[in-house]
Amino acid sequence: MTYLKKDTLNPDGENIHLFELSAFSRMTYIEFMVEERKSLPTDGLTPDENFKIATLLTMRDQAMLVALSLSEADDEQREGKEIFPEIMRKYPPGLLGSAALMVRMLSGMVPPVITETEETIEEDAPDLEKS
């Protein structure tokens, strides 16, 4: 039984069931990101090399996020690290980005969007401390 939120992504009529990250999966994801960045060269890179590294890191981060999410399914026996290579091979960049965004939203990893209406209401509200 899982208490995690879930949602479905429907690329080309297929259903991909994505889950909120558990506390354990979130820790695994953070550890993965830290280790990925430790191995990066820091000096003497050209702008093109920096762009390539940033692109590769983004895709790897997104793939791990999706893999960890998929590993949360009750019927999934593999860990996220085992699913990761499959995600890297089978997901095109656009689908990978969409899936990763959905996982971030399910997991509360995306800051809430403040609409213009909400900002106006907050500005117009009386300041109780000044009263």
Residue positions per predicted region:
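Short, surface-exposed, charged amphipathic helix/loop patches that serve as local interaction elements
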Residues: 2-4, 17-131
